Amino acid sequence: MAKESMKAREAKRTKLVAKYAEKRAALKAIISDVNVSEEERWDAVLKLQQLPRDSSSSRQRNRCRVTGRPHGYLRKFGLSRIKLREAAMRGEVPGLKKASW
């Protein structure tokens, strides 16, 4: 199980990403637009740097919903490989069964 502080930190990052998403997208659009003057683009770069570091979506880490485990995460289910296996063995995941060949 992940520490509660790590889960809370990840939740905080998710909120920050949602809060600054529009502002970040607007600044990135200005930066990538070649028709805008160099000075305006540079100002946009500086403003983007002023935003909180955790407001970037690349700082987020996918974590298991049950345990908070960061490794072995399966996006389709939102669980780690361990918890997915346990749920599948109990028959809690519809359409998923143990492979045999």
Curated annotation (Swiss-Prot):
Biological process terms in GO annotation: translation
GO MF annotation, one: structural constituent of ribosome
- Provide one Gene Ontology cellular component: cytoplasm
Could you list this entry's UniProt keywords, alphabetically sorted: Ribonucleoprotein, Ribosomal protein, RNA-binding, rRNA-binding
Q: Which InterPro entries match?
A: Ribosomal_uS14 (IPR001209), Ribosomal_uS14_bac/plastid (IPR023036), Ribosomal_uS14_CS (IPR018271)
The record's section on NCBIfam families has: PRK08881.1 (NF006477)
The entry sums up its family as follows: Belongs to the universal ribosomal protein uS14 family.
**Name of the protein in question:** Small ribosomal subunit protein uS14
